[in-house]
């Protein structure tokens, strides 16, 4: 697909593992990315920042990196800043886009100011009176609700709460993972979708139909009964409109090159954007490879396309 001489990429590090709650997902993503790059003849090597100092990248002659880290310092701008310091080109968003993209609270603030529709929400701080805040939130947002740490990915510690009595405990649990907790009105009736973004590729929307209550960690990475619908069932005009909004939702955060934007539709077909992912999963359950495969792009071709953006 790319027609690029593999030698142009030089020595490439596939960053994988790390120390976040998503370490296992990252290891799985990274191994597949590594194989995909090697299948294309690229000189790619695994590199786990949890086990080796980043300075080794420069010392060992790496000139670019494919970032397959998920969550934590791999996705919040820290790795990106370090790679900038060492002069190593890398896939995905830079410091600002990565930091904002992982922070659901500040993502939603930017979206509210730029006209991107997002579900109504409240924030709770670690150490708040959870019972009192729960009562106030239910009065404002109603039920059901989603409770999620502000800066975790892969649906880590996300809970759908359907009764007011269960909300204080959900807040307490989420606050173990982040000092800021997002409580979001659940958008019901139209289903969940994701828009995969990869440079100039026109990838189809995917409708996600989990067997359980919502698209949680188990549904994303373990279960085999989650349905991924491509085509997504929307008419062409609506799909094009939602892809355009998704791209804008990505761009206004300062995100670049590739990622995902997730959204829900209400019963009337109105979109509500939930979050972006600037370092999306690349496992055999993950969404970008599925979207690419639907338009005839192999896994290896996709990862080479993403890596090729570091040549610009």
Curated annotation (Swiss-Prot):
GO terms for molecular function: ATP binding; D-alanine-D-alanine ligase activity; metal ion binding. It catalyses: 2 D-alanine + ATP = D-alanyl-D-alanine + ADP + phosphate + H(+). GO terms for biological process: cell wall organization; peptidoglycan biosynthetic process; regulation of cell shape. One of its GO terms (cellular component) is cytosol. Binds 2 magnesium or manganese ions per subunit. It is an enzyme of class 6 (ligase). PROSITE patterns: ATP_GRASP, DALA_DALA_LIGASE_1, DALA_DALA_LIGASE_2. Residues 108-308 form the ATP-grasp domain. Mg(2+) 2 binds at residues 275, 277. Pathway: Cell wall biogenesis; peptidoglycan biosynthesis. Mg(2+) 1 binds at residues 262, 275. Its cofactor is Mg(2+); Mn(2+). Signal peptide: none annotated. InterPro entries: ATP-grasp (IPR011761), ATP_grasp_subdomain_1 (IPR013815), D-Ala_lig_Van_CS (IPR000291), D_ala_D_ala (IPR005905), Dala_Dala_lig_C (IPR011095), Dala_Dala_lig_N (IPR011127), PreATP-grasp_dom_sf (IPR016185). Its EC number is 6.3.2.4. Gene3D superfamilies: 3.40.50.20, ATP-grasp fold, A domain, ATP-grasp fold, B domain. Keywords: ATP-binding, Cell shape, Cell wall biogenesis/degradation, Cytoplasm, Ligase, Magnesium, Manganese, Metal-binding, Nucleotide-binding, Peptidoglycan synthesis. It is found in: Cytoplasm. Its main location: cytoplasm. ATP binds at residues 138-193. Cell wall formation. Belongs to the D-alanine--D-alanine ligase family. NCBIfam families: D_ala_D_alaTIGR (TIGR01205), PRK01372.1 (NF002378). This is D-alanine--D-alanine ligase. It comes from Burkholderia thailandensis (strain ATCC 700388 / DSM 13276 / CCUG 48851 / CIP 106301 / E264).
């Amino acid at each position: 697909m790319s027609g690029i001489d593999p030698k142009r990429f030089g020595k490439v590090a596939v960053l994988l593992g790390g120390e976040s709650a998503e370490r296992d997902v990252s290891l799985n993503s990274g191994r597949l990315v590594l194989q995909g790059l090697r299948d294309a003849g690229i000189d790619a090597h695994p590199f786990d920042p949890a086990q080796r100092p980043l300075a080794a990248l420069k010392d060992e002659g790496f000139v670019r990196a494919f970032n397959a880290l998920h969550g934590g310092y791999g996705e919040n701008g820290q790795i990106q800043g370090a790679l900038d310091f060492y002069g190593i080109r890398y896939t995905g968003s830079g410091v600002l886009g990565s930091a904002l993209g992982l922070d659901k609270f500040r993502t939603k603030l930017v979206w509210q100011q730029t006209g991107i529709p997002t579900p109504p929400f409240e924030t709770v701080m670690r150490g708040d009176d959870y019972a009192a805040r729960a009562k106030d939130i239910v009065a404002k947002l109603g039920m059901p609700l989603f409770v999620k740490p502000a800066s975790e990915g892969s649906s880590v510690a996300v809970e759908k709460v359907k009764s007011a009595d269960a909300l204080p405990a959900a807040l307490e649990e989420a606050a173990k993972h982040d000092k800021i907790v997002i409580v979001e009105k659940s958008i019901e009736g139209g289903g969940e979708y994701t828009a995969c973004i990869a440079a100039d590729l026109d990838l189809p929307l995917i409708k996600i139909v989990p067997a359980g209550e919502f698209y949680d960690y188990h549904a994303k990475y373990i279960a085999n009964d989650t349905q991924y619908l491509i085509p997504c069932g929307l008419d062409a005009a609506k799909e094009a409109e939602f892809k355009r909004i998704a791209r804008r939702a990505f761009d206004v955060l300062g995100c670049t090159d590739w990622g995902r934007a997730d959204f829900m539709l209400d019963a009337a077909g109105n979109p509500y954007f939930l979050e972006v992912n600037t370092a999306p999963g690349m496992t055999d359950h993950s969404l970008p490879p599925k979207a690419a495969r639907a338009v005839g792009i192999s896994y290896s071709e996709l990862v080479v396309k993403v890596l090729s953006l570091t040549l610009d």
